[in-house]
UniProtKB/Swiss-Prot annotation:
Family membership noted in the UniProt record: Belongs to the NqrF family.
Name of the protein described by the UniProt record: Na(+)-translocating NADH-quinone reductase subunit F
Any Gene Ontology CC annotation: plasma membrane
Protein topology in the membrane: Single-pass membrane protein
One GO term of the biological process aspect: sodium ion transport
Main location, first listed in the record: membrane
Length: 407
């Protein structure tokens, strides 16, 4: 009798386990996609892909690269596309990035959209011109205390077909980087010592992707050049240092860097209007690209001025290049303003924050600032101050173009 009860108990237990397994398998079949699905793109291109991933990564695996400065985290909202069919309902993580009208039209963040069934999507046509390269670090010196000029050499015979003001994405692998190993030139080490920057360590467990504007212009072939500022934690905080910028600061000539691009929307308008460029910090990069493109490649006759703000002369770079451009082009003037000139600078030029300098020394007496086009890139506080000043002068928002790298 006891043996029968044991046998019965074992049988019932086995039946329960098999039943649970069956339920799990049925649920998995319902909830987890498997097999292949088809993605129709713009009604012209078709991909057959495995189901189960996110749309952004699935497209990238098939050499269709949407911009994603946050690397698929759902925060930058650059990987937008229109999902005509498939993809399921919009997720809560996407809702804040779209208006109700856009949501009805099918706009989605591709990094949040699951690939579970056949889909039809629309993406910008320029996406099909985006490529991927493994580049080699040519040089990576400091050009300011906390800014590196990273120059990457493309593979032989390759070029980036981009417009001035465009950007690419850099990919950095998992790493452990110690700031004490950085190669910082002697003239910039004082502030690194003062703020004890050497104590930081960057530890990254997953691949990180970030977007950076290019400092070169289209006729500077074979390379891509960037101005990248180290993203150190605010004083007194326990926040980790910037993942990508820490890795970039540790790069040495000969190191390999994966690059995707080009992308962009911070492009010059094709008009004859006066162009006023305003920059600060690492916002120099797209300013240089635009100004060199206008004067060196396009031979533009438009009236162009550039207003750049730096803390001291040590933080100003490319000054000789702009001096040369100004000497060669009567339609171009550039102005450097220092907010905190040091005694050794012996500075007799413009001083103050760049939005005040621009207003007091130019726009205050300009006959029609509302007819100018303003292109800017710099720290968020600078951008906000300049935009307020311009709108107070009656400049329409469509004539204020911003490369908002600072969030």
């Amino acid at each position: 009798m006891i043996g029968f009860e044991i046998f019965l108990a074992i049988g019932m237990f086995t039946a329960i386990v098999l039943g649970l397994v069956a339920i799990i398998l049925v649920a998995r079949a319902k909830l987890v996609s498997s097999g292949d699905v088809t993605i129709q793109i713009n009604g012209e291109h078709s991909l057959t892909v495995p189901a189960g991933g996110k749309l952004l990564q699935t497209l990238a695996a098939n050499n269709v690269f949407l911009s994603s400065a946050c690397g698929g985290g759902g925060t930058c909202a650059q990987c937008k596309c229109v999902v005509v069919e498939g993809g399921g309902e919009m997720l809560p993580t996407e809702e804040s990035h779209f208006t109700r009208r856009q949501a009805k039209e099918g706009w989605r963040l591709s990094c949040q959209t699951p690939v579970k069934q056949d889909m039809q999507i629309r993406v910008p046509e320029e996406v099909f011109g985006v490529k991927k390269w493994e580049c080699t670090v040519e040089s990576n010196p400091n050009v300011a205390t906390f800014i590196k000029e990273l120059t990457l050499r493309l593979p032989d015979g390759e070029s980036v077909d981009f417009r001035a003001g465009g950007y690419v994405q850099l990919e950095c692998p998992p790493h452990v980087v110690e700031y004490k190993d950085f190669d910082i030139q002697p003239e910039y080490r004082g502030d690194w010592d003062k703020f004890n920057m050497w104590r930081y360590v960057s530890k990254v467990d997953e691949t990180v992707i970030r977007a950076y504007s290019m400092a070169n212009y289209p006729e500077e072939k074979g390379v891509v050049k960037f101005n990248i500022r180290i993203a150190s934690p605010p004083p007194g905080s326990d926040l980790p240092p910037g993942q990508m910028s820490s890795w970039v600061f540790n790069l040495k000539p000969g190191d390999k860097v994966t690059v995707y691009g080009p992308f962009g929307e911070f492009f010059a308008k094709d008009t004859e209007a006066e162009m006023v460029f305003i920059g600060g910090g690492a916002g120099m990069a797209p300013m240089r690209s635009h100004i060199f493109d206008q004067l060196r490649r396009l031979k533009s006759n438009r009236k162009i001025s550039f207003w750049y703000g730096a803390r001291s002369l040590r933080e100003a770079f490319y000054t000789e290049e702009y001096d040369q451009l100004q000497a060669e082009n009567p339609n171009f003037q550039w102005h450097l303003a220092l907010s905190d000139p040091q005694p050794e600078d012996n500075w007799t030029g413009l001083t103050g924050f760049i939005h005040n300098v621009l207003f007091e020394n130019y726009l205050k007496d300009h006959p029609a600032p509302e007819d100018c086009e303003f292109y800017m890139c710099g720290p968020p506080m600078m951008n906000a101050a300049v935009i307020k000043m311009l709108t107070d002068l009656g400049v329409e928002r469509e004539n204020i173009l911003l490369d908002d790298f600072g969030g």
